[in-house]
Amino acid sequence: MKFAVIGHPIKHSLSPLMHHANFNALQTDDEYAALHIDPKHFHHLRDIIHEKAIDGFNITIPYKVDMLQVVDVVDIKAQMIGAINTVHIEDGIWYGYNTDGAGFKASIEKYTGGKNIVILGAGGASRAICYTLFKDNKVTVLNRNTNRVADWPFQIDAYTYEESDGVIQQADIVINTTPVGMEGFMPDTLIDISQLKSSAVVCDIIYTPDKTPILQSAAQRGLSVINGLDMFVNQGALSYEIWTGKKANKAAMKQAVINYLQRSTLC
């Protein structure tokens, strides 16, 4: 079978590396390519995918929201999240899914359930994670403004960072979904880590660098920290299961990404 990831830009994507590690571990002859789709050609996407005989694909920036208007059938989770990151094609019908929220939830499963969770940011990743966690936990969003959260089709409490003191003190889990801390962005922790209780867990959906400023500060306080690597692997594994009905080899996928990142650090 043939799979791909589409985006603009796309050359930075580690998805082909990760998925080919899975194919090798499972001894399949599946293929996975990174396809750059220029915005001016996006309206030809169905023709492009058909021409390349692709069976399923992932979507990254900037097309996750736009895909809602392209697919034939949208999964209920993708509808609520308002974005699609996985498309499965069967008998010419395009089915749209979102595995981001479930991918993240799987990475922190042992910590969740009846917890006070504070999510930093109100973008697409935040919405996916909020939707996946809010039914079993008390979820609060902190963002520069709260307007975006008010438009979501499910109810979440939201505050600005200036209003965050009491919220942070009660947090069991803090999750950064913003690009702050990613390479090329201003180093910042967004919140006062010293206000967190000693049992708090701090997460970041970023996996390069492996410890963003917020994770570094939390680790220095002795708090448990989790970066975004497991989320990346889990969402990819879930995509593979949607496409094929088979379980992915997540250990092989994760190790391939770790090896690549370690080599990159040494260069």
Curated annotation (Swiss-Prot):
One of the GO BP terms on file: chorismate biosynthetic process
Record flagged with keyword Glycoprotein: no
Catalytic activity: shikimate + NADP(+) = 3-dehydroshikimate + NADPH + H(+)
Catalytic center residues: K64
Enzyme superclass (EC): oxidoreductase
Pathway, per record: Metabolic intermediate biosynthesis; chorismate biosynthesis; chorismate from D-erythrose 4-phosphate and phosphoenolpyruvate: step 4/7
Keyword set includes Membrane: no
InterPro entries according to UniProt: Aminoacid_DH-like_N_sf, NAD(P)-bd_dom_sf, SDH_C, Shikimate_DH, Shikimate_DH-bd_N, Shikimate_DH_fam, Shikm_DH/Glu-tRNA_Rdtase
EC number(s) given by UniProt: 1.1.1.25
Gene Ontology CC terms, in alphabetical order: cytosol
Residues annotated to bind NADP(+): G121, A122, G123, G124, A125, I205, G228
Pfam families per UniProt: SDH_C, Shikimate_DH, Shikimate_dh_N
Residues engaged in binding shikimate: S13, L14, S15, T60, N85, D100, Y207
Function: Involved in the biosynthesis of the chorismate, which leads to the biosynthesis of aromatic amino acids. Catalyzes the reversible NADPH linked reduction of 3-dehydroshikimate (DHSA) to yield shikimate (SA).
Subunit structure: Homodimer.
PANTHER family: BIFUNCTIONAL 3-DEHYDROQUINATE DEHYDRATASE_SHIKIMATE DEHYDROGENASE, CHLOROPLASTIC, SHIKIMATE DEHYDROGENASE
Family affiliation: Belongs to the shikimate dehydrogenase family.
HAMAP family in alphabetical order: Shikimate_DH_AroE
Designated name of the protein: Shikimate dehydrogenase (NADP(+))
